[in-house]
Design a protein with these regions (language model features):
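N-terminal basic/disordered segments at the start of proteins
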Residues: 2-22
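Generic hydrophobic/aromatic pocket-lining and core-packing "Φ" positions
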Residues: 13, 42, 68-71, 131, ...
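Conserved, mostly hydrophobic/aromatic
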Residues: 16, 142, 190
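Glycine-rich phosphate-binding active-site loops on the catalytic face of alpha/beta enzymes
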Residues: 23-34, 76-90, 141-150, 193-217
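Glycine-rich, positively charged N-terminal anion/phosphate-binding segment
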Residues: 32-49
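Charged helix-capping and loop-helix junction motifs
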Residues: 37-42, 95-100, 124-131, 155-164, ...
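C-terminal helical cap(s) of enzyme catalytic domains, especially alpha/beta-barrels
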Residues: 40-45, 91-102, 203-239
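Conserved anion-binding
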Residues: 51-154, 168-172
Length: 239
């Protein structure tokens, strides 16, 4: 399992790097769950990180093909782009939006579709329906996140349900990532359900998700990611 840390600028990127994050994710928490940073800010983050780690970027929630394509083109060159579908309830429309992002991101940049655990509240597609969209559009992976940040992922969806979703994603040949107000205490559960990547913002910050990324907090989280799995941990005791 790998650790993704969301940063809003080059200063935080340096802290995340120094703390040992595996993926540096460009995101503006003031603009929502998938708030995009400016093209200039993304470029500064990429210069700071260089070749040391992969850089991902949030594109926000998709609304129309022109805007999505422009955002993807501006972020081209990142290792992967995260695209949400808040307000999108049609699989056909989601496919059109995902294809627009994939086309303009370029062949070297992968696309990760973001499903919301609180999908009804976000007026979005259910996570299993978004898996079908990902398969049809050639996405590289799926991230299960929360649109609203007032409850953590495993408070909204049981570990057993997440495990079944992760298994379906991986069976389709895609990578499965988890986020959504996760703390270090959730990492053992994330590992047990089969997640390949965990994404955090608030847990890595001093002062919450709108605070600043702390090198020490990232290092502590990475220690939990790398900790050997507990032989006694199972989904049966987590459910």
């Amino acid at each position: 399992m790998r650790l993704l840390v969301s940063v809003r600028g080059p200063v935080e990127a340096r802290a995340a790097l120094a703390g040992g994050a595996d993926v540096i994710d460009a995101k503006d928490p003031a603009r929502g769950a998938l708030g995009a940073v400016s093209a200039e800010r993304l470029a500064a983050i990429r210069r700071t990180v260089g070749a040391a780690r992969p850089v991902s970027a949030a594109l926000g929630d998709a609304h129309d093909e022109v805007t999505v394509a422009a955002a993807a083109a501006a972020a081209a060159g990142a290792a992967f782009l995260k695209l949400g579908f808040g307000g999108v309830t049609s699989e056909a429309r989601a496919q059109r939006l995902a294809r627009a992002a994939r086309r303009d991101a370029g062949a070297a940049t992968a696309l990760v579709l973001v499903a919301y655990a609180d999908w009804r509240r976000a007026t979005s597609l259910a996570p299993d329906h978004l898996l079908a969209v990902a398969v049809e559009t050639g996405a590289a992976g799926l991230l299960l996140d929360t649109a609203w940040k007032d409850a953590p992922l495993f408070a909204l969806v049981s570990p057993d349900a997440v495990a079944a979703w992760v298994a379906a994603v991986r069976a389709a040949g895609l990578f499965a990532a988890l986020a959504g107000s996760l703390s270090g205490a959730d990492f053992a559960t994330a590992r047990a359900v089969g997640a390949e990547l965990v994404g955090v913002r608030g847990a890595a910050c001093v002062g919450g998700r709108k605070g600043r990324v702390s090198e020490a907090r990232v290092a502590a989280l990475q220690g939990l990611v790398r900790a050997p799995p507990s032989p006694t941990l199972s989904l049966g005791v987590l459910a």
